[in-house]
Swiss-Prot record:
Its EC number is 1.14.11.64. Acts as an alpha-ketoglutarate-dependent dioxygenase catalyzing hydroxylation of glutarate (GA) to L-2-hydroxyglutarate (L2HG). Functions in a L-lysine degradation pathway that proceeds via cadaverine, glutarate and L-2-hydroxyglutarate. Is extremely specific for glutarate, but it can use both 2-oxoglutarate and 2-oxoadipate (2OA) as a cosubstrate for L2HG formation. Pathway: Amino-acid degradation. NCBIfam families: PRK02963.1. Transmembrane segments: none annotated. It catalyses: glutarate + 2-oxoglutarate + O2 = (S)-2-hydroxyglutarate + succinate + CO2. Binds 1 Fe(2+) ion per subunit. Induction: Induced when grown on glutarate, and also moderately up-regulated by 5-aminovalerate (5AVA) and L-lysine. Keywords: Dioxygenase, Iron, Metal-binding, Oxidoreductase. Pfam families: CsiD. This is Glutarate 2-hydroxylase. It comes from Pseudomonas putida (strain ATCC 47054 / DSM 6125 / CFBP 8728 / NCIMB 11950 / KT2440).
Length: 325
């Protein structure tokens, strides 16, 4: 079966076959597609963008699109249509991407360039206040005293959407694993809204569209609260979410009880998908109908995982996609 048959709603013509990479449904879920880039493609990309350090991409934002163009050219123009169609397709909307040969922390700069190329073939990554850049790198170790669950290794980080506490459209999230040592557990956890057993009940609840207050801890470096509902709709009236349990501030008993029930329903879903992500690989998902989290790690004094994230908006005809944000 051609994996392209998974994509139900085309926004631009698909190539007959991918060039320079393969595409197939993942073992974990037919909604999550695996793109694997050939070593030759990756090496050619690394060589072609060697003239620009990551700092150049930080300072000159148009270069982020240029490295995307280079990667698409190496794939003979077949990559951008696949990325766009997949990220916008309600039936899929998620990818696990592996560039063969980029699998060591010493190649971290090339990993950032490669992920940036993919992200900027579909849109643009937003400013990340935590890092002051269009991406953020952070480390998880065995002990943690931070002010959110992002770096806490020995507990599950609950399912959530990104961008809930900023006034920016967050259509996609990209999560790259740069390095890990002495690591057991810690798989990515995913849930597609259309697979969540109780989605319809919560979506139809009177509180689903009530504007709520969202605030972030100091580490996020976001000073102002934002206000929005937990649920919204896409252009076809299907549910979308902007939700994270840590940062929503219920105004009263009614809201608090409903939010607790919503959290318990998400965490108790039997449709959660556990996805191992190798060093150098990354997830690229639609942030509005996929929720993501992380399973707990097994304690180890030498535990270390370094991650990078990008999150942003899809720069393709918006009326075809998302309204209400």
């Amino acid at each position: 079966m051609n994996a392209f048959t998974q994509i139900d709603e085309l926004v631009m013509p698909l190539p007959l076959e991918p060039q320079g990479y393969t595409i197939a449904p993942s073992k974990q879920s037919p909604r999550l597609l695996e793109l694997t880039f050939a070593r030759e493609t990756v090496e050619a990309f690394v060589q072609a963008v060697a003239q620009w350090p990551v700092q150049a991409l930080e300072y000159k934002s148009f270069l982020r699109f240029r490295v995307g163009e280079i990667l698409d050219e190496l794939c003979q123009g077949t990559l951008r249509p696949v990325l766009l169609n997949t990220i916008l397709d309600r039936a899929t909307g998620g990818m696990l991407i592996t560039p063969i040969g980029l699998d060591d922390v010493s190649q971290a700069e090339d990993m950032v360039k490669f992920t940036t190329a993919c992200a900027h073939l579909i849109g643009r990554s937003n400013y990340d206040a935590m890092s002051g850049q269009f991406y953020a790198r952070f480390v998880v170790v065995n002990s943690d005293n931070s002010d959110s669950y992002l770096r806490q290794p020995h507990r599950v980080m609950e399912l959530h959407n990104d961008g809930t506490f900023v006034n920016q459209i967050t259509d996609y999230v990209l999560m790259l694993k740069i390095d890990e040592k002495n690591m057991e557990g810690g798989n990515s956890l995913l849930l597609h809204l259309d697979d969540w057993e109780q989605c319809e009940a919560f979506f139809r609840h009177p509180l689903a569209r009530r504007e709520m207050r969202w605030t972030a801890p100091p580490s996020k470096k976001v000073a102002e609260d934002v206000f929005h509902s937990v649920f919204d709709t896409d252009a076809e009236g299907r549910p979308t979410m902007r939700y994270i349990d840590q940062f929503v501030q219920p105004e009263n008993y009614e809201e608090g009880i409903w939010l607790n029930a919503l959290s318990e329903s998400l965490e108790g879903s039997g449709k959660k998908v556990s996805v191992p992500v190798g060093v150098g690989s990354f997830l690229l998902i639609n942030n509005l109908f996929w929720l993501h989290g992380r399973d707990r790690f097994t304690p180890h004094e030498g535990l270390r995982r370094e991650l990078m994230r990008q999150r942003g908006y899809v720069a393709f005809p918006k009326p075809l996609y998302q309204r209400g944000q």
